[in-house]
């Protein structure tokens, strides 16, 4: 029994053996997605996590991170904060954005110099039982804006059931799902928090993006997500990033 436990421990360790080497590359591409308005207090408000891909000026995040911040004349500006070579966060204006609400994804085109980009990998090769990792800002800026990394195991690849704010919308979504077809989503055995939304789910050895964290199962109230995390999170497969990117090149 002791020998079996040792073997299992070694197998688990080897799955994340390259994480320490991959992390510097991953963290260089992690950004903060939020809003900025002079009359707001605080002026900058974090909405979620994002990460840079492609040519270094395209950010991936969740569509729900943008909800309620776009389309209104008096809405705060949608901005992204990137970490400069001096380690300080720099605010970048979002020049335009594209949404895929069906898959809860969004692409943001930002101004300025290119940021180190992550490679979008092949999410079709992800299997149940795979050990992955994700990085983001789980509890916002409470402890400062420092990206945090968690390990995750793919516990299930299951049909998506994205949350809706009302029963009526749930019914409409179900109808659209039947019309447009359903898609699979990664269920993760991992502790994530609302601030992780939009962060990359990646291969811990190569750093390639295999999914986007999009929701956390919350037991009870939203506040209980911090005090009593469910240990269950979900991620959108990366193939939908590729499809959205191709539509808006």
Predicted stretch roles:
Residues 54-100:
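Catalytic-histidine neighborhood of serine endopeptidases
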Residues 21-22, 69, 95-97, 111-146:
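Active-site substrate-binding loop(s) of clan PA
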Residues 12-14:
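N-terminal signal peptide c-region/cleavage motif recognized by signal peptidases
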Residues 26-43, 109-119, 148-246:
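Active-site region of chymotrypsin-like
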Residues 76-79, 85-94, 128-133, 147-171:
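Beta-strand/loop subdomains of soluble extracytoplasmic proteins
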Residues 2-10:
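Bacterial N-terminal signal peptides
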């Amino acid at each position: 029994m002791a020998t079996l436990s040792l073997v299992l421990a070694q197998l688990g360790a080897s799955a994340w053996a390259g994480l320490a080497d991959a992390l510097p590359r991953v963290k260089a591409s992690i950004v903060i997605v939020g809003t900025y308005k002079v009359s707001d207090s605080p002026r900058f408000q974090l909405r979620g996590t994002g990460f840079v891909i492609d040519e270094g000026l395209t950010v991936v995040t969740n569509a729900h991170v943008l909800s309620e911040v776009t389309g209104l004349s008096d809405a705060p500006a949608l901005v992204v904060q990137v970490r400069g070579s001096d380690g300080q966060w720099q605010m970048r204006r979002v020049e335009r954005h594209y949404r895929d609400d069906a898959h809860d994804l969004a692409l943001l085109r930002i101004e300025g110099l290119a940021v180190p980009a992550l490679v979008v990998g092949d999410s079709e090769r992800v299997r149940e039982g795979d050990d992955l990792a994700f990085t983001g800002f789980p509890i916002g800026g409470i402890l400062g804006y420092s990206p945090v990394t968690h390990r995750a195991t793919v516990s299930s690849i299951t049909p998506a059931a994205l949350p809706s704010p009302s029963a009526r919308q749930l019914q409409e979504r179900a109808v659209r799902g039947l019309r447009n077809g359903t898609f699979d989503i990664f269920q993760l055995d991992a502790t994530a928090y609302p601030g992780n939304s939009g962060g990359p789910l990646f291969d811990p050895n190569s750093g390639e993006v295999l999914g986007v964290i999009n929701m956390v199962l919350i037991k009870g109230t939203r506040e209980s997500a911090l005090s009593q995390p469910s240990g269950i999170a979900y991620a959108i497969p990366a193939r939908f990033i590729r499809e959205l990117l191709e539509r808006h090149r």
